[in-house]
C-alpha cells in the first residue's frame, strides 16, 4: 500500500449534532439567563424581540447553552491481505450527554487520530472541548488543539 492509504487509516472523520440544553429560555438555569440575554443582544436583529425569544433556535450552537446530542464518526480500516480499505462508522448517542462524550473520549484515546470535520476547527472541536470541560471530562490528546495549525 502507498503511504497515502496507510495514513488514511489514521483519520477520524466526525460530525456533531447539538441542541439547546433546555427546551425553553424559562427552563434555563437562572444564573445563565442574564448571560443568554447578553449573547442574544449580540445576535438579535430586531430590538422588538422578547428576551429569550431566540433561545430555542440559537442556543444549540453555543456550547454554554447547548449540549451534544450525538457524535457520528467514521474511519477507513486497512485490510492489507486484500489490499483494500473498509469504511467503518459509528454514532455515539446516549440519553445523558456525559455518557456520549465519555464514549467518544474512549475512542479518541485508542490511537493517535488525526481529526477531520467540516468546520471542525471553528465549531465541532471547540464545542466538544467546552462540553467535555463543563461535564468534568479531561480532554483526550486529539482535542488538545492549543498551538496546532491545520
Q: Where in this protein do the model-derived segments appear?
A:
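Metal-dependent phosphoesterase core characteristic of DEDDh/y 3'-5' exonuclease domains
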Residues: 2-9, 66-95, 101, 105-150
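Entry/capping segment at the start of metal-dependent catalytic domains
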Residues: 1-66
Amino acid at each position: 500500500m502507498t503511504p497515502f492509504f496507510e495514513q488514511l487509516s489514521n483519520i477520524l472523520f466526525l460530525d456533531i449534532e447539538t441542541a439547546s440544553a433546555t427546551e425553553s429560555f424559562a427552563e434555563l438555569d437562572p444564573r445563565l439567563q442574564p448571560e443568554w440575554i447578553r449573547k442574544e443582544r449580540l445576535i438579535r436583529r430586531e430590538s422588538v424581540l422578547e428576551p429569550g425569544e431566540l433561545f430555542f433556535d440559537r442556543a444549540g450552537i453555543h456550547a454554554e447553552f447547548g449540549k451534544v446530542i450525538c457524535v457520528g464518526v467514521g474511519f477507513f480500516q486497512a485490510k492489507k491481505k486484500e489490499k483494500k480499505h473498509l469504511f467503518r462508522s459509528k454514532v455515539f448517542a446516549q440519553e445523558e450527554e456525559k455518557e456520549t462524550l465519555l464514549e467518544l473520549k474512549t475512542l479518541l484515546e485508542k490511537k493517535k487520530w488525526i481529526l477531520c470535520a467540516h468546520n471542525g476547527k471553528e465549531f465541532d472541536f471547540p464545542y466538544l472541548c467546552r462540553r467535555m470541560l463543563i461535564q468534568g471530562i479531561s480532554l483526550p490528546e486529539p482535542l488538545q488543539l492549543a498551538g496546532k495549525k491545520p
